[in-house]
Amino acid sequence: MTTRRGQRRSASRRHIRPSSGGPGRRYIAAVGMAVLAAALAACGSSSGGSGSSSSTASVPAAKNLTQLRQSVTKASASVTGTYSPGPAIPDMASLKGKKIMALPGTTLIPTCLQDAETIKSIGDAAGTPVTMINDTGEISQWDSAIDTAITEHYSAVDFMCDDTPSLIIPEIEKAEAAGVKVFGYALTEPLKDYPGLAGGTLEPTYSDYSTMLDQAFVATGGKPINMLVISSVAVIGNAQDVAMLKAQFAKMCGSSCHIYVSDVEVPDWGTKIQPTVQTQLLTHPNINVVYPMFSGEYTYVLPAVEASHRSVLVTGAFGGGTPQVQLQTNSASNKIIIGDMTSDPVWAAYEMYYQTALDLAGQTMRPLSDTYTPNILITTANAGQVLTGAAWGYGFVNSYRKDLGLPPLSGAALQAAATVGS
C-alpha cells in the first residue's frame, strides 16, 4: 500500500548513509505498538467474526512467510554508516541563558522519562538551562506546565512522548500568543494539523503497523490471528491509522481472521486499559493477539494478558526504555517478550533538541519529513547490543554535538552519552 507516510519515510533515507553492503534501515514511528500473540492452542472460533482454525491454507500471509521473516530480520539489523543531522548552528552563544522546559508526557513510561532526561543533559551542556517536569500523564499537569512556561518566560517547551500535543491545542495556542514556542515529539501528521505548535519531529506510523503484523504472522507460523486493537482516536491521526491497520490486516489474513477494536483515550490509560483487555480476553477466548497502538499502553496491557493465565508471546514497539529492554535479557521474561520495535531514546532526544535550537537561533528547522530516527526491532538476540548502545552505534552523538557547538566525546564518555536511556 502506498501512503503519504510511506513517501515521507523514503525521503528520510538520505540522512543515513549506509556503508557499502550494509543493510538498509526502516524509518518508523516511536508511536508504540505491541503485539501480544497467545500460544496457538488458545485459538478458537471467533465470536462475532469468522471462525479461526489451525490451518494456514486460507491465510494469504502464510504464502509469504519467507518474505515476512526477511522483513523481521532486516528490521532487527544494527544501524550502519555515517550520519549528518543537518546545518551547524554557528550562533549557539546567542542561546545561552534561554530557558527550555522538558515535558516528558509521563514519567511513568521509561522511554518518555529518558527522552526528557537526555534533553536536559544536552541543553544544560549547551548553556540553555532545562527544567524537567515530573508529570504522570494527566492533561491538567500539561496545562499547568505550559502556564508555568508562560508566566516564568521560558523560551521553549519540548513536549515529549508520542503525539500528546494534539490533546492540549488550546493551551499550546495560548503559549504561542505569549511568545513561548512549543515543540512536539513523534508527531504523526503535518505541522498544520497542530495549531500553535512551533515545530518538532515526525514519526510516520504505517510502516510500524506493517512490520508488527509481519512479526505477528511469523510468530504464529502464518496461522489465523484474532486481534484486539487498543486505540486512542482522540489523538490526531489515530482514527486513520486504525483504518489502515484494518486494511493491511484484512489483506494479510483475509476472512480467516477477526479484528476487535477497543478505544481508550490517553487520560484513561492508567485506569481503563487493564480491565478493558481482561474483559475482552474473557469475552472473546479466540483472541490470540493484543495490539496496543501506543507505547504507553503496553505498560497496562501486559499485566492484563499475564492475569489471563494464557501462554503469550510479546512483540511490539514499546519505546525502548531500559527496563523494557532488560526484560528481554531475563531468562524468565524473554520467553514471553520476543520483540520491541523502537527508536533510540538518546538519538530521538538529540534530534528534538537540535530542532528546538535551530528555531531559537533563527535558523530554518529541518522539514518534519526529515526528522525521524532509525528504529530497530529489539529481540532476545540483540537486546544486549541495544543496552550497550552498539545497535545504533555512537557516531550520531558527536555529529549532533558538532552542529550544536559542543566538544566531541570519546571512549567511555562517548559510550555513556550514547547509552543514556537505551
What are these regions (language model features)?
Residues 38-42:
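C-terminal motif of bacterial Sec signal peptides marking the signal peptidase cleavage site
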Residues 183-192, 291-335:
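Venus flytrap/periplasmic-binding-protein-like
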Residues 83, 87, 199-227, 240, ...:
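Hydrophobic alpha-helical segments within soluble ligand-binding/sensing domains
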Residues 57-97, 344, 349-422:
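Hinge/cleft segment of the Venus flytrap/periplasmic-binding protein
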Residues 56-65, 69-118, 122, 131-143, ...:
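Extracytoplasmic "Venus flytrap"
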Residues 61, 166, 171-207, 226, ...:
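Flexible loop/hinge segments that line or gate small-molecule binding clefts
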